[in-house]
Structure formats: C-alpha cells, structure tokens
C-alpha cells in the first residue's frame, strides 16, 4: 500500500478521504488485492478467535474505504453495498469502535447516515443534471468543479475534498435552470459543518423562483442556528409548498458567516461554507 501511495503521487493529509485515492492506492485492482490478503489472513487464524478478531478489526479501514468509494459511483451494486454496510456495522459494534474520525463521529451513526443519505431514493430530484449559473461564484478551483457537483445526484462525504463546492469569506448565489417550466413542491440545499477546516453553516438561505429567469418571486427565507460542535455534520435547508409551483428557474442565495466567530480559534480569519447537492422535487 505504501508503494501504491508513493507511485500515485497523491498526498495524504489530515482531512483526507478514501475517495481522494480511488484512482491511486485504493483503485479497484489494489482493493481486490488487499481483500484477498485479508481473506487469507482470516483463513489462517480461523481456529484462533483472539487472532481472528485482531485481523477483522485491522480490516475495518479497508471496509470503510470500500463504502466511501462506492457511494461516489453513479452505477451501484446495491445488494453488494448493503451486504458490506451490514458487515461493517456488525464489526464496529462487536469491537466497540468509538469514533470514525478525528472529529469523534460515531461509526454506528455513519452506517445509519449512509442508508439515509447515500443510498438511492425512490423519487429523483428534478434538478438532476440541470444547468447551474453562478451569480456569486465559488472560490478558486471550486468555480470549475461547481459546474456539475451541485446537481449530480451524489452527496458529499465527511470531508470537503469530496464533491463539495465552497465559498470563502463571502456570500453565494446561483440559479438552477430546469430546462422548462415544471411543477415543484420543494427545494433543499445540503450544507457541511467541519469547524476544524473553518467550514461553518451559513447564516441564512433565501429561495425564490421565476418562469422567465428575470422576475423572481420570493419563496422562503431560512435563518440557521449557530453550530459549535466539533463533529462533522450535514444540514439540509428546505423550502416547501403545499400547492405545486410552476417554474423553470430556482434561485438560491446564501448569506455566509464570512469570518470565523469569536469562539472559533480562527477568529477574524475568513470562514467557508460548502454546498454539495441541491434537490428539487
């Protein structure tokens, strides 16, 4: 694995994700090799329970990596993913693994979140594959990455390097073009909280809509409560209507914190907010 990491040229860092290495040290051929070696190791100590448990516990990072990479794929073997998720949950409970990462997220909570967040939903988002026009563009490299990431149907993970689009020290705004007028009932934007990376939930989100892309009608303004926990969290900010709204364009305006607050160790420095997915139904 060390040789594969060096050969890939992909660096490791504190807020890394297995997804960063899906084409390097965690590419399919190497993952098959790692699993084969663990299969052999488990077989070799099958008659010795204490040693078997050690091998099974050592295998957990590979199992976690498989799950993380699988959720980023557009084509999924759902039976296989559910089987792996069930086994991972069974093992972390058996070995009483307390945390998943440096931010104390629970691995049992991760399994629950995985089923709710990353497994395909019955109702598809109307925003899937829609055109996104930025009124206040994302920061730096995220401007290019943001062309598709907000409407690709794939939710980001617990680190911002994975599918998230960020704005630093500013507000954000964009318009989603559904291509034609459609009846919609709700819009929801997904945000990331990771204070160790100076990523905070925004202060406010405003939704509006228009059939012509020019004359917008206010839908809803949502103020977000402050979040100070060290755990990585996700928050969906949603506007709903009891009656269908016929529209083609949906505008999302986000008011960011812009600076780290007084209680944060980065006080006075620019803060971020990150969005991954916008869901319209």
At which residue positions do the language-model features occur?
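Short, surface-exposed beta-strand/loop "edge" segments at domain boundaries and coil↔beta transitions
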Residues: 70, 141-142, 184, 260
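Short intrinsically disordered coil segments
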Residues: 147-149, 223, 267-269
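Solvent-exposed serine/threonine-rich low-complexity stretches and specific carbohydrate-binding patches
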Residues: 218-228
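Compositionally biased non-globular segments, especially hydrophobic aliphatic-rich helices
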Residues: 44, 130-133, 152, 213, ...
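Aromatic, loop-rich ligand-recognition surfaces of beta-strand-rich domains
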Residues: 156-220, 236-281
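Short glycine-/Asp-/Thr-/Trp-enriched loop segments that recur within the blades
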Residues: 229-233
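Predominantly extracellular/luminal regions of secreted and cell-surface proteins
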Residues: 121-155
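Catalytic domains of carbohydrate-active enzymes that cleave complex glycans
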Residues: 1-125, 129
């Amino acid at each position: 694995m060390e040789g594969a990491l060096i050969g890939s040229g992909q660096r490791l860092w504190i807020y890394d994700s297995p997804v960063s290495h899906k084409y390097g040290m965690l590419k399919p051929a190497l993952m098959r090799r790692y699993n084969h070696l663990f299969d052999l190791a488990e077989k070799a100590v099958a008659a010795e329970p204490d040693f078997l448990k050690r091998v099974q516990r050592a295998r957990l990072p590979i199992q976690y990596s498989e799950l993380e990479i699988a959720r980023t794929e557009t084509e999924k073997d759902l039976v296989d993913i559910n089987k792996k998720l069930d086994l991972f949950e069974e093992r972390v409970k058996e070995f009483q693994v307390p945390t998943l990462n440096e931010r104390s997220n629970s691995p049992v909570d991760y399994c629950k979140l995985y089923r709710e967040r990353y497994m395909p939903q019955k109702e598809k988002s109307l925003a899937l594959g829609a055109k996104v026009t930025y009124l206040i563009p994302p920061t730096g490299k995220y401007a290019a990455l943001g062309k598709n990431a907000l409407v690709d149907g794939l939710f980001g993970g617990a680190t911002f390097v994975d599918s998230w689009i960020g704005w630093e020290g500013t507000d954000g705004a964009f318009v989603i073009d559904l291509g034609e007028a459609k009846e919609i009932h709700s819009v929801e934007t997904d945000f990331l909280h990771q204070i160790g990376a100076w990523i905070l939930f925004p202060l406010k989100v405003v939704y509006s809509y228009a059939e012509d892309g020019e004359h917008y009608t206010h839908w809803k303004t949502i103020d977000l409560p402050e979040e100070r926990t060290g755990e990585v969290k996700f928050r969906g900010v949603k506007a709903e209507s009891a009656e269908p709204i016929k529209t083609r364009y949906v505008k999302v305006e986000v008011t960011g914190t812009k600076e780290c607050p007084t209680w944060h160790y980065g006080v006075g420095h620019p803060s971020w907010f990150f969005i991954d997915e916008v869901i319209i139904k």
